[in-house]
């Protein structure tokens, strides 16, 4: 993308719901690494009606550049012992937005947002071992590869290995 500074994150609006539903229900958009079969088509509308898709334990923000929708980022709370938690984040970009640096920029923006507005020390992201583009985007965004997770994702009839990444608050300092 020519001007990655124009890529921003913003809350989901009601007008975004058809785009979100289309992305989540399209094997073409979710392929090759995020298609897990059909799922509840009303899930996003119910979440939006409940809390605007900005809940205390999981949330979604749109990735946009001007009026162009590029995809979305999400995060969910992972509780650890003693009331401690961290975030696990993910991304889904439309095919036209891939390979342009948008994923790297979106990961950076979301990590900065979460560290600015929550007291977590750590944010994780994971992807399939064969998703080299996502691994590169995470590394360019400042995430550190921590290890291989064997047989962690069941997709397309078989178990697949994943790769775990993290970024710490001090990594952004």
Predicted regions and their residues:
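Acyl-donor (CoA/ACP) binding surface of acyl/acetyltransferases
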Residues: 1-27, 60-173
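Surface-exposed alpha-helical segments enriched in charged/polar residues
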Residues: 49-50, 112
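A short helix-loop-beta-strand connector motif used in the catalytic cores of GNAT acetyltransferases and
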Residues: 50-62
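Conserved GNAT-fold acetyl-CoA-binding loop/helix
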Residues: 28-49
């Amino acid at each position: 993308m020519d001007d990655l500074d124009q890529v921003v994150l913003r809350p989901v609006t009601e007008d975004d719901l058809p785009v979100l539903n289309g992305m989540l229900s399209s094997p073409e958009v979710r392929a090759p690494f995020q298609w897990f079969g059909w799922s509840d088509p009303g899930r996003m509308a119910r979440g939006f009606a409940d809390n605007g898709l900005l809940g205390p334990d999981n949330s979604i923000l749109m990735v946009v550049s001007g009026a162009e929708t590029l995809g979305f980022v999400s995060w969910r709370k992972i509780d650890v012992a003693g009331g401690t938690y961290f975030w696990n984040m993910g991304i889904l970009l439309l095919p036209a937005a891939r390979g342009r640096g948008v994923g790297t920029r979106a990961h950076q923006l979301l990590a900065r947002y979460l560290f600015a507005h929550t007291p977590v020390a750590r944010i994780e992201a994971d992807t399939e071992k064969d998703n080299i583009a996502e691994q590169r985007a995470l590394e360019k965004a400042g995430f550190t590869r921590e290890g291989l997770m064997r047989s962690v994702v069941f997709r397309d009839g078989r178990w697949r290995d994943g790769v775990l990444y993290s970024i710490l608050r001090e990594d952004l300092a």
